[in-house]
Amino acid sequence: MWLYGKREKLLWAVGGTAALTVILLSCSTFETNRSILAPPSIPGAEFVGSEACETCHESITRNFRTATHARLKAPGDNAKEMGCEGCHGPGSLHVSSGGEKSKIVNPRRSPDTCFQCHLEVRARFEMPHHHPVLEGKMSCADCHNPHEGRAIKGGGTSLPQQVKGGGTLLLGQNETCFQCHVAQAGPFVFQHEALKEGCISCHSPHGSVNARMLTERNAVLCLKCHLQEQKQGGAIFIGDSDHTTRLPQGTCWSAGCHEAVHGSQVNAHFRY
């Protein structure tokens, strides 16, 4: 995390080392201990295995082999419940009908399929401020591609998270958000450094108790990076700027001081 103040170099060094460790561990991990909690059921259908899916969905099944979801274990000893049918349900009726869409589960149309395993995400969508997935206006697949890469359609400017695009970063985390949030995309003459870490450094995309799906309330969010300290003589500095007094309640932008929080074309301090 970028930190403006005395501890910047130390924290950046520690954070960089930790990030490298995570990357190395990710690259060396070929299987996961997580199991599919509840594969979907389809009345009258049986599991046929992912090989049957490959007959029609060749490119999807080929890319899926490198995806996180492909490494999930099946409940019990039924290996056929792994792979495609772990999320789409048993496919025998879908296959025998020549690909009839009503005879297979499509998580894009039913986010409850994803929520069978992602229970904590389902809970976040119940929070006061959230993306409208439960309301049916969005689906998990609008931001995530479970068939490729590590499954998050974006990984920040340089973060190796799951993305959409053949196991590579076709869309960064920010670019995924900017598909809808166009005004925040820029480019700006003066860009907020926080964007380099990705939108999720400030926002909780599944849901939050805070307005605008912010991860923290009020000025606490800004102070995670911009250190507030009292110097000799009583002056209050935030970063390198003398703010005279400690931050009031509210946020740095709602108070009318830094309204262009994502970036500005005319002011280096994001005042407007």
Predicted segments — roles?
Residues 2-12, 22-272:
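Short sequence/structural segments immediately N-terminal
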Residues 17-20:
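Hydrophobic alpha-helical membrane-embedded or membrane-associated segments
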